[in-house]
Amino acid sequence: MTTATLSDQAQLELVRTRHVRQMELTVRILQHILARVDDATATTLRDPDDGAKGWTTLEVLCHLRDYDEIFYRRAQMMAAGGTPDLPGYDHEALAIERRYNEQDPAAVLAALVESRARFVDFFQALTPAQWQATGIHPERGLFTMTDAAMQVGLHDVLHIEQITRILASA
């Protein structure tokens, strides 16, 4: 190993730091994308890849807000210890039950920004022992705290692409 080579632990810490930074940036990207999207556009244009059943920009934004909270609660459960079984959720049912497309886009985005700041603070405050925490994900099995940090930004990117595709269809 040369002096320019990072240890495995240092590399892992760098990956974690970068994913937490990505969590901050993806919300800022959403704010920029949505800054000039009016309510009518946010609630009428649908994902062209899914036809009439495709989600609107507002529905995608509500999904991001709700899953930010879900991901946060799962990470909290893991940090508390004991390799918990993490709860699963039906995202389509949530969209219907919570009437996503009837919500206020500005309020939804503000709630996501607030939730994300709390989530970033959570990750930045984790101890080395808490970073080692695991849970059992309902779809993926064994799930690490690093997986949890990576999931947030990757989930955001998936849906940012979806939102830009919806808006580009206008």
Predicted features and spans:
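Solvent-exposed interaction patches of small proteins and small membrane subunits
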Residues: Q11-R21, T43-D49, G81, E102-Q103, ...
